A protein has these predicted regions:
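Short glycine/serine/threonine-enriched helix-capping/active-site loop
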Residues: 43, 70-73, 151-153
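Acceptor/aglycone-binding surface of glycosyltransferases and processive sugar-polymer synthases
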Residues: 16-20, 24-32, 52-131, 157-168
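Catalytic donor-sugar/metal-binding loop of nucleotide-sugar-dependent glycosyltransferases
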Residues: 105, 126-129, 139-156
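Short beta-strand-to-loop acidic/aromatic patch adjacent to the donor-nucleotide binding site
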Residues: 37-49
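Short, high-confidence coil segments that cap the C-terminus of an alpha-helix
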Residues: 38-39, 66-67, 146
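Acidic helix N-cap motif at the loop->helix transition within catalytic regions
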Residues: 1-10
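Residue-level signature of catalytic and energy-coupling elements of molecular machines
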Residues: 29, 47, 117, 141, ...
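Hydrophobic residues within well-ordered alpha-helices
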Residues: 7, 62, 141-143
Length: 170
């Protein structure tokens, strides 16, 4: 995977985390960001599946002070066929149903493309070091009764091979 080399060539500052796990990578990035005290933090997958050009849609509700958290929901009509596995679709539906049942949450997806106010993110005290990072964030947003919005976004097949198997074991 040449993501980091491509990002550096495009002018991005790349922070490396050697431990496996989506959460480890996110926590490492947040540790680095803490030095700069940003206003908004955006998460998106670097595998081409998210449309980075849709960033304005994700951050606008936060900039306009409508909400502190905005998630991109991978709408069935907007996503490329085959971009999500059957396990991902069922897992998302189940997780969102449980969040609605337990916390009256109005999420339809656990999409990775999301933005949150830095201060709000600090209040969440994120801990998950593996693939549970996205659901942990959404559950904590609900528990803390933070304002949120879901925006329908496009989604396409990833480049390369997924590091998550789509099974309960990961």
């Amino acid at each position: 995977d040449n993501t980091s080399q491509i990002a550096e060539k495009k002018g991005a500052e790349v922070v490396t985390e050697n431990r496996k796990g989506y959460g480890y990578a996110c926590l490492k990035g947040l540790e680095h960001l803490a030095q700069n005290n940003p206003d908004i933090v955006v998460f998106l997958d670097g595998d081409y599946s998210d449309y980075a050009e849709d960033l304005d849609q994700i951050v606008s509700p936060i900039i306009l002070k409508e909400v502190v958290f905005c998630i991109g929901a991978r709408d069935k009509k907007l996503r490329e066929k085959g971009s999500l596995t059957y396990q991902q679709i069922i897992g998302n539906k189940l997780a969102c149903f449980l969040m609605k049942w337990l916390y009256q949450g109005k999420f339809s997806d656990l999409g990775p493309f999301r933005a949150i106010k830095w201060q709000s993110l600090q209040e969440l005290k994120m801990e998950d070091k593996t693939y549970g990072w996205t659901i942990e964030m959404q559950l904590k947003v609900l528990r803390k009764k933070m304002s949120y919005k879901e925006i329908q976004v496009r989604y396409r097949k990833r480049l390369g091979v997924s590091k998550v198997s789509g099974t309960i074991k990961g």
